[in-house]
Amino acid sequence: SGEKRPAGAAVVVVSGGDAVSPFTTPDQACATGLAAGNSDTAIREYLLGKGYTAYTSPAMNGRGQVVDQQGFGAFGVCPVTLPENMTVNSTGSIDTAGEHLARFVNWLHDEKGVTEVDFVGHSMGGLYSRAAIRVLATTDSKVKIRSLTTIGTPWQGSYLSDYANDLM
């Protein structure tokens, strides 16, 4: 699109449940395998191709920092590994994931000059993004959240969860 974007504007791609995704910048990604992991690589490449400044937020299926992956969705030799407190635990609580994602967004402000963010959340990434937006709004973050776009986010919960909890 021909729209001029502000210098500090960025898109942050947020992975869904049980995802493992490395942190990437517009200029740096993993050197082997999928550049931004299984669920974020195609979205990242599309956004970069359209001229957006796109970052992928780090996610790990469990606590801890992102580690290189083998097998399905493999990636490795990534440029930077961010600390656990900025890494979404994609199998943990939504609220804690939101806190970690908010910390990551504030880090983007401090380290990369990001002042405005458009979130793109895949699956549970939409819920993690919504939780981060709440944290950013209540902590006087210097980053303006412009939008949240979700892809397959379970806003109404899940049928399987309702069934498992005998709500059907």
PLM regions: where:
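Generic serine detector
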Residues: 1, 15, 21, 39, ...
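Serine-dependent carboxylesterase/thioesterase catalytic core
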Residues: 98-168
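Active-site catalytic motif of lipid deacylating hydrolases and related acyltransferases
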Residues: 9-116
